[in-house]
Structure formats: structure tokens, C-alpha cells
Amino acid sequence: MLSRPKPGESEVDLLHFQSQFLAAGAAPAVQLVKKGNRGGGDANSDRPPLQDHRDVVMLDNLPDLPPALVPSPPKRARPSPGHCLPEDEDPEERLRRHDQHITAVLTKIIERDTSSVAVNLPVPSGVAFPAVFLRSRDTQGKSATSGKRSIFAQEIAARRIAEAKGPSVGEVVPNVGPPEGAVTCETPTPRNQGCQLPGSSHSFQGPNLVTGKGLRDQEAEQEAQTIHEENIARLQAMAPEEILQEQQRLLAQLDPSLVAFLRSHSHTQEQTGETASEEQRPGGPSANVTKEEPLMSAFASEPRKRDKLEPEAPALALPVTPQKEWLHMDTVELEKLHWTQDLPPVRRQQTQERMQARFSLQGELLAPDVDLPTHLGLHHHGEEAERAGYSLQELFHLTRSQVSQQRALALHVLAQVISRAQAGEFGDRLAGSVLSLLLDAGFLFLLRFSLDDRVDGVIATAIRALRALLVAPGDEELLDSTFSWYHGALTFPLMPSQEDKEDEDEDEECPAGKAKRKSPEEESRPPPDLARHDVIKGLLATSLLPRLRYVLEVTYPGPAVVLDILAVLIRLARHSLESATRVLECPRLIETIVREFLPTSWSPVGAGPTPSLYKVPCATAMKLLRVLASAGRNIAARLLSSFDLRSRLCRIIAEAPQELALPPEEAEMLSTEALRLWAVAASYGQGGYLYRELYPVLMRALQVVPRELSTHPPQPLSMQRIASLLTLLTQLTLAAGSTPAETISDSAEASLSATPSLVTWTQVSGLQPLVEPCLRQTLKLLSRPEMWRAVGPVPVACLLFLGAYYQAWSQQPSSCPEDWLQDMQRLSEELLLPLLSQPTLGSLWDSLRHCSLLCNPLSCVPALEAPPSLVSLGCSGGCPRLSLAGSASPFPFLTALLSLLNTLAQIHKGLCGQLAAILAAPGLQNYFLQCVAPGAAPHLTPFSAWALRHEYHLQYLALALAQKAAALQPLPATHAALYHGMALALLSRLLPGSEYLTHELLLSCVFRLEFLPERTSGGPEAADFSDQLSLGSSRVPRCGQGTLLAQACQDLPSIRNCYLTHCSPARASLLASQALHRGELQRVPTLLLPMPTEPLLPTDWPFLPLIRLYHRASDTPSGLSPTDTMGTAMRVLQWVLVLESWRPQALWAVPPAARLARLMCVFLVDSELFRESPVQHLVAALLAQLCQPQVLPNLNLDCRLPGLTSFPDLYANFLDHFEAVSFGDHLFGALVLLPLQRRFSVTLRLALFGEHVGALRALSLPLTQLPVSLECYTVPPEDNLALLQLYFRTLVTGALRPRWCPVLYAVAVAHVNSFIFSQDPQSSDEVKAARRSMLQKTWLLADEGLRQHLLHYKLPNSTLPEGFELYSQLPPLRQHYLQRLTSTVLQNGVSET
């Protein structure tokens, strides 16, 4: 084997090694392969590869001398395959012609003649080294118009000027000047002076560009002058137009940079000449240099004009005077130095004119007249320079700066502005919403672009601003503090409601079908369009999640940035199930968070700032997993199975918070979030295997609770951890008590059922003795408000645990009923009954009204900083103490107490009466009275929906307890009526997610005879007596209203079945809600409630079966079954009559006009339904209720009615149906006549007299049965000319006769009589002509009876057969007016109209 060369071996040794290698014939270790060109094409691709050619070094052929140090020829690009060389061209000739090597250039060099060039010797000086050049030295001798020339160029120009001046005094110049007769390029000869083109202003006194420099002295002047004369002769032979044309052609051919250089060169020479001539005028030797004007005088004159406009001294009062010798200050631009002046005084605002908002660097809103010092850095802006602070437009402009620090500063200020705006600091000082303004300006995508920045500081500030925008302060604190409330883990999604509401048929479509149908449309929409309606969806469409994962996984940011990212992810997960799924499925995002921020082992972390959160457990990361798990049972199962959360939960829960080697607060929050995550998983029946492993830990934690409760003062974080522990035990107890789900036919419902829980009853049966002492200890603090508020969540969680414990105990088939009944009796006697008798509990009931949202609807006004595209709870400023979520709120404790009492009363019937005594509390009675009273309903906002849901829980549990008590013993009449009114009000207010409560109210309280005490206290008899005493009894017989009410009470079960059929929620929603409220954990699909866009039932729900019946009849041309139609209509009318008579407050939210429209639907459903005697009696009774004197003034048909697009359209349809099928039915006719009153729209009367004249013959309702007074139709007089003409036409043609339609006949006669005898001087000519013509025709009528009625009408009187009184003789004024008109008619004839 050949050895490698070693250091020290000579070239002879290397050649010897080479000969040995060649003689051996071994294969080389490296093979040279010629690569193709970079264009991808290989010109020599057909050649075979070189196999045997090797590079051999031969020292014999090397030259003796080293090569010349000349630059090698530049690399030449190989011709591309698409460019073919000409075949007839010699390659050598082509290379020779394009050869640019130094050897080819040297052969073409012509030596420059320097014999005529003056040589100046250096100036002798007395120092050893030349003087050092300083930039600040005086350069007044330089040209003032040097522009942007370098210092070297300025020095050269100054030297040329000095040379042009000649030697100064005392300067030694050797006699080596040019020979006599030599001229320079600036000195014109006499023969070329005064050369000027004819017709041109340009004179040529000598050559300018061609100087002859470099030629021999004899030939220089001659050649330059010859070229100049040839140019002059050529220019003189051309016309001015040809010169300009040739000039434009040359300019187009030349390089623009070259043209600019020539022009600047000419202008520089001109300025140099001027300066030199001016400086040499006083005396001394000078060269006779004449100024030349260049050809393009317009370009050269511009600098001179600008120089003339510039003053010698600054006109502005600047702090310092700029010197031209300063760097880059040779040309002073005064307009750019305004910023150096002193600021003008702050303008005081004298009017209410709006001014631009300006903010400090901390995001504070500055007053318009505030005067702050300039060293604060708040005056670096152009507009309104005297005002401190920066506007939003200026901050937006700064975010696009090229300096990263400026971008970070702008984002930081904007984040501070958003935080302060959401905190409500600006109040009403700003016109409009800051968040809406920023979102409309594109701030969202500005943040998204900033996240892609390369500077870590900008990324961190952008993430901080994104958190300030998305995460409203206070929202997470509110949801965390209420996690242990009654169903506190359930939340509404924080997403905007859909603007376009679907039809009822589309609402009944399954949610999966809707999502599939809408997803392609949403995917095709661009992110800005999505963000306009939903900020979160717009952000997710911009690949935000992968970017946040990259920041966490690659850049390793600081703790603040990590917490901001986790907070943003929590807000995204709370948006909807879809957003939570996208967060879970983002590649490596959850893996990174679990790996880096939820490790199973970590180094101890002390108190104080943490340098890094990586490899340290983070409570916020645990909370993110908990929020994700709350979105659905499938997400929870994936989290538990795919990310090894079992070991992490065991690691954190197994140790007490003080033993976790973390800061105390962080350890408490981490332990609390771990318990909550486990509780959420247990809400789906998952995570039961952890209970067996951590059973000793949980028992030890429960045993320590009494000691922690005795701490003074109690620590809030510890109380939250204890409440979370009790909530976890509550869910585990429910899981142990739940039985395996039965077989379900529906596959969708079967998917909700899981395997039986791994927790058994024997494993949780020992928890109650440990929890009950904790409850007893906390109840002792009830009389101490401060301590009670501190331990607030603990007694709530204890009560909820006891309720779940007894519920699960009673469901165990192996347990003895006597055991749990005796234990309930013991708990009631020892704990609950003494609690109910405490005065402090009464104070909690009294504070319900002060903390209620229903009793204080103005307390939930939507916040100003609440853009519809970005939903938040709006708890930035914290909840007031006397509010539902405040520290003094009695709702969580009383709701948990009522839940426990309901559980005990349902299991132990003997305790029901004793426990129901709590309902007699005066505070609860007053609270119910105020909730039932009519008033403005709270505006439905995200916070009001959250708060009202908890308030409705308390109301429902109180009503459920009252229903259980009423089933055993009669309730007091006043209490029963109050509870029934409360149930009716609650039924129309329940929000989505409470479908089970709606169903239970329909089953129990609403249609129970126990809550209608009027049926046994003389209610029907009182109704009959009221009919007899009613002033309107002479008009509409009420058909025995008392009898109808008594019959309705007997038919109450049928009425309940009817409403259960038509008002029950969808089956899937009902089952999901039922599983949540019953504790059937295996069927719970999600802890995320449906969107609270509106209540489950409309305000007019008593008419809902009738409305659906009307829609079914409209969609079914063949008609509906008479049996179903008759039964549904009767039950609805009976129930509405009960409400109108005994619970009128339940229908106060339904306007009388809407009730009238619903009654019309009875006649529109079928052509025979209204003929049935029961329906006739019920409709007549309800019509009489609408026509009562206290209700009739509120009947307004001109306003917009709920559920109705247009009442005139409904009335036109009603007239069509009346004309077709009524056959003169009096009740039908009464409903037709009711909207024709004078105070209603004239459109309704025009519809009858203009389009349905044939219906007049069927309106045979007698005057005595008219439901309202006749004066409602005749007063005030009609002023619509078209309707008056229709009245007169129907009277004259006989279409309207007193025996066919007595009511409208009297109405038409009254209005026509009032019109023809009206003498209003302000009437138009058209009205006067119509009045005169109508009176003339009336006087000439052949029908004497009609003529007598129209002329002698006096007053309406429904007791007379005609319906009005007549004058026996016309009044004198009318008689005189009629005689004057008739005399004119006899003379001129009757005018035609």
C-alpha cells in the first residue's frame, strides 16, 4: 500500500510517489467528473465519461519564471442550449474580437502626451508631517452648492479653484508653465466668440466637452477647434425644430444616468466659474474664464432659482443656527427644521368640539389641554405638535417602522390602550369604542403579521397585545371562582351569535348536518371577512396555532410570553367545540405544552420571579387542558389517553401544595387546576381508575380540611382548592351511583353511553362522615359576614356533595332503605332544620332582590367596549359586592341548599313538609313578587345569559320544592298563585341548556290544579258574575265564562299533553340536558352549553300550538284531520282563557294586537273549525277580554308584531277567507270589524271597500253585538279622499245597505255627511271640488231614504235601528250652504267627476 506524503519531502519525492502509483495501475480514490451547466442542460451530455485521463504533473515543461501578476480572464458563461452560435463564424475570430484580457488591452493603449501639463511642486512647510484634515475646519472657500458630493470631491473642486486663481502672495511657483500660446478649454479664441445659431438664444463661444486634452500641444487646440466648427456648421444648417427633434432622439438613446451626469458637470463648471470670477475680481492674476450657458438651460436654471430663494440667514427662530460646514448641512432645508423650534402653547378648548384622542406610553388617555414636559417623549409627532401623546393613527404608523424597538413600543402602547379600554378607564370620555375602531382598522391582522417578525421582542409584544385584545380581564377569574357552584362547570361558548336566523324547519335539522352544510362556505371565505363577524374564526384561518406552537417549541420565550400564549389558547378553546378541536389537533401543540410545562419531575423553584417556565409545572397549562376537556367527552378521553395525563395528575395531586417545590401561590393553583381537570373528566364518567390509586391521598386531604378552615383569615386559594376537591368527590360519587345505561335504539344516543364507571359505591360510601363536619364548621361562620364570604365556595360544595351522596345512596339496589332514610332524618334534625330557623339565613333571602339580575335589569347594560365580533363576559372591573357574582351574593349558597332539600324531599316524603317551610321566607316571597311583576327584561348579553342561568336554577329548585309540598298538602292560596305565576314567567325565560327544566315545568307546576286556587275559591262564579255586571254585556254575550273556566280546569291534563307535544324541546337536546341535571354521567356529551341567542320558548308560547297548526294547514292543501285540529284549537283557547282570566301578567309580554292576530289563525286553519260551538264560545270570551276598556287602548295594529311580518297582509288573507267561507257568521264578522276602527291604518279600510266589496253583504253583525262602541268608527271624521269616494260609491250603488251591513252603513253615512258639509278653508282645490260634486250628487239622489240619511245625519246611536240619529230639519248654516249650491246647480247643471 502506498504511503501518504509526509512533511519535509521534496518535489522529487512527490514525483517518485506519482510514478509508483502509475506503475501499480491502481484505481484512483477520486474520479473527476465534469458537471453540466447550472441551467440544467448539458452541452456535452453525449460524450462518454472520461475513464483513463489523469492529471500528471510534469516539472520539465514548467517555465523558469513565474507567471506575470495580471488578472485572469473572467469566467465566461457557457451558451445556453436554446441559443445557437452562427455556423459560418470562426470561433477564434469571435474569441479574439471579444477578448478582454489585460494583454489584449495593453496593445491598444496610446500614451498620453504630458509635455504640456504644468507640474506644481509641493509647498514647503515648517512641520514634519502635513496638517490633518478636520471636518469642522473652516471651508468657506468651498462652493456652497456642493450638494451631496463627498469630502474628497469637495477638496478636489477647491483645489481646482485655487489653481485657477494662481499663486498667492509669497508662493513660489517654478517656471514650468505651459508654453506661450497654449490655451485651455475654458479660453475661447477670437474667431469663435459670438457664434450663435440663427433664431436661437444659445450662443457657442468655444468647445465645452471636447477640449483636446491629452493630444500634443500643437494638435490639441486645432483638433478641438475643428470639431467645434464642424458642430456649429451642422447646427446652423438645421432648423430649430430639427435641432429639438435630434436632441430628443439623442436623449432617448443615451443612458439617463449619463445625461444626468453631463448636466450636473456643466452646472458644476458654471458655478465654479462664477465663484472663481467673483473671487478674482478685486485683483491679482486671473484667467479670463467666460461663463458658458449649457444647451438645456431649463435644467441648469433650477438650482440657481432654488439658490436665490434660499435666504442667507434662517427665517425661523431656531434654537441653534445651522452652519453650512456641518456635515450634510451644506444645503439648509428650513422647512425640515420646524421640529427644532419651541413648541407652541397648548390650545385651550373653548367649545364642545371633539378632539383627537392621544395616549401616553402607558396607554393612559391624556386630556386635550394637559401640558407635559417634552423629556417624557410624548411630543414626537407632526400633527398637533403642542399636544402630548400619540393618536391611534400615529401608533399604527409606528408599527410599520423598520426599527424593531419602535415596532415593539407601538405594539406595547396599543396593548396598554386596549387593556385600559376593556377595564373601563376611558368611560364616556371617548366617542365610540376603541376596540371596534382598532378591529375595523385591521389591528387584528397587524398583530398576526407581527407574530411573523424575526425579532423576539416584537413577537413578545405582539403576543401581549393579542392577549389584551382577546382575553377580557376578569372573565377567567369569574369562571374559575364559580366552578364549584351548582352546575358551575357548564359554560356558554364565547362566540358571536349568528346574524341570519334560520327558519324553523332548518332549526330542526341536526347540528351535524348544519355544520357539514356551512363548513364549505366558511372555508371559502377570506380571513378578513371571517374576522368581521367573528374575530376568533378569522384568527384561526391565518394559521395562528402553528405559529404559537413554533414560538413555544423553537424560540423558548420568557415566562410572560408563555403565560400570554396559554391565555390566548384558553380563550380560543372557550370559543366553541370547533375551536377547541382545532387547538387539540394542531400538530405538536398540546404535546409541546404537556412536555415542557407539565413535567413529572422538576428542579425546586423558589419564591420570586422565575427565569423560565420550561420544565416547570404551570397551572395555566393545566387549566388549558381542563378547558379543552370541558368542550366534549371525546376531547377529554383523547387528552387522558394520548398525553399521559394519568401520571401527571398523580404526580401533582399525590403531594400537598406545600410539598411541590414550587412557589406557594403557584403550587396552590396547580393543585386546584389538577383537581378541576379530574373533576371535568369525572363529569363524563372518565378517570375512575385514578380514584383507586389516589384514594389515600384524597382521604388525607379531607382530614386536613377542618384545620385549614380554622385558619384566620382563610386563604382564598386554599378555599378554592378545597371546593375543587369537594366538587371532584361529588362527580365521583355520582359516577358510583349511576347505573349502566340501558340499550338505546338511536345510534347517536348510544354513542353517548360509555362503559360502566370504575368507581363503586363501597369506595365512596365513607366520604360523607368526612364532609359533613366541614359543612358544620363553615355554617358556624354564617353569622360573621367577613368570614362567611372568605369560605364562600366551601359550604356550597359541601351541600352539593351531600345531595349527590344521598341521591347515589338511594339508587343502590343492595342498600337498605331504612338506613339512608334514618340518616336523612338525622341530618335534617341536627343540621338543616336548625339552619332554616336561623335569622341570618333570613338575611340571605332578603338580599336576593338586591343581587338579582331580573330585579335590576339595568345592571347588565352591555359594555361600551364590547364589539359584536369579539364576545366576552364584560367583568373587567370586577363584579360589585351586591350582585349575583359578587362576594355578598346569596345565590350560590341558597341554590345549593335548595338542591339538597329537593333531593331529601324527593327521597324522604316525610321530610317534605318540614323542609318546605323555607319557602315561606318573606325575602323569597318578595323576590318572587318582583320577578313576576311586569317590567323590562334584561338585555341578553353573554354575562346576563351566564348570570340569569344561575338565577333560574334557584327559581326552578324553589318551585320544584313547592310542587313536592303541594302534592302532599294544599298550599296557601296566595302562595300557590304566586308560585304559578313564577313558573309561567320562568317557562318563557329559560335559556338553551335548560331543556330538561322546561320539560319538568310543563309536567309539574304549570298545569297542576294545586297551583290554580281560583278553581276552588269561586273563580268561575266570579267570572260569571263579572259578565252580568259588565258594561259591555249588552253587546257580546260571554257565553258563560265561568262555565268555560271550570271546563278548562277539568281538561287540564289534556291541555298539558297538548303543550307537551308542541312545546317540548328537541329530543337530543332534552336528553343531554336531562343527563346533566340528573347526574347521568355516561350520557353527558359536553359541558359546553348551546348558544344563548334567545329563550327556549317565545313569549307567546301559549299560542304556539295554534301557530304551528296554522303553518301546517298552510303547507297542507288537502287539509288537516278535523279531530286533531279541533282538539288542539280547543286546548289552546282554553288555556289562553285561563291565563287571561286568572294570570293576566303571564300575557303582558304579548301585545293585544298579537293576541288578536293569533285568534284570527283559528278561522284561517280550517273552513269549518270556527263553526264548532266550543270554539265559538271560547273565541267570543277571548274577544271580550280584548275589548275590555282597560285593554282596548293598548290595541295597536300599526306597530311591528312578534312573529308577524305585516298585519295588513294577514288582514287581507283574513278578508279572503271571510268572503269565501263565513256565510255571515257574526263572530267572524266581529273580528273583521275590529281592525276597521278609525284610529287604525286606513290601509285596512281601503282593503275592504276597495278590493273586497263583496264581503260587505256578509257583514251582518247587529249593532247590539258590536264588541266596541260605534264612536270608535265614526270619530274623528275621515280625511282620506279615496276612502270617502269609496264610501259614497258603495252607498250610491247599493253595495252597502243597512240590512246587509248595519255597522258599516252607519259608519259610511257618518263620514260622508261630515265630508260634504265640511267648510274647512285650508282644504285643497281637489278636496273642495270633490266635496261640491259629492253634495250635488247627494241632493240629486233618486233614493229618498239614502238622500235623507246623508243630508240629515246627526249623531251615532247604536240603540236605534239605523245606528244614528237624524235632524228633523237641517241647521241654518247647512240649509243656507245647500240652497246656495243647489241654485248654482240649477243654473249651470251638474258637474261630472
Curated annotation (Swiss-Prot):
Cellular location(s): Nucleus
Taxonomic superkingdom: Eukaryota
Primary localization: nucleus
Biased composition (Pro residues): 64-74
UniProt GO MF annotations: DNA binding; nucleotidyltransferase activity
A single Gene Ontology CC term: DNA-directed RNA polymerase complex
A biological-process GO annotation: transcription by RNA polymerase II
Keyword presence, DNA-binding: yes
Consequence of changing R525Q: In a colorectal cancer sample; somatic mutation
Modified residues (Phosphothreonine): T321
Residue positions where Phosphoserine is found in the record: S72, S1121
Compositional bias per record (Basic and acidic residues), positions renumbered to this chain: 518-531
InterPro entries the UniProt entry points to: RNA_pol_II_AP1_C (IPR013929), RNA_pol_II_AP1_N (IPR013930), RPAP1/Rba50 (IPR039913)
One Pfam family of this chain: RPAP1_N
Region (Disordered): 34-53, 61-94, 266-295, 496-531
Ranges of compositional bias, category Acidic residues: 500-510
Keyword Transferase: yes
Keywords assigned by UniProt, alphabetized: DNA-binding, DNA-directed RNA polymerase, Nucleotidyltransferase, Nucleus, Phosphoprotein, Transcription, Transferase
Subunit relationships: Part of an RNA polymerase II complex that contains POLR2A, POLR2B, POLR2C, POLR2D, POLR2E, POLR2F, POLR2G, POLR2H, POLR2I, POLR2J, POLR2K, POLR2L, RPAP1, FCP1 plus the general transcription factors TFIIB and TFIIF.
PANTHER family xrefs: RNA POLYMERASE II-ASSOCIATED PROTEIN 1 (PTHR21483:SF18)
Family designation: Belongs to the RPAP1 family.
Function: Forms an interface between the RNA polymerase II enzyme and chaperone/scaffolding protein, suggesting that it is required to connect RNA polymerase II to regulators of protein complex formation. Required for interaction of the RNA polymerase II complex with acetylated histone H3.
Protein name stated in the entry: RNA polymerase II-associated protein 1
Organism: Homo sapiens
Gene that this sequence comes from: RPAP1
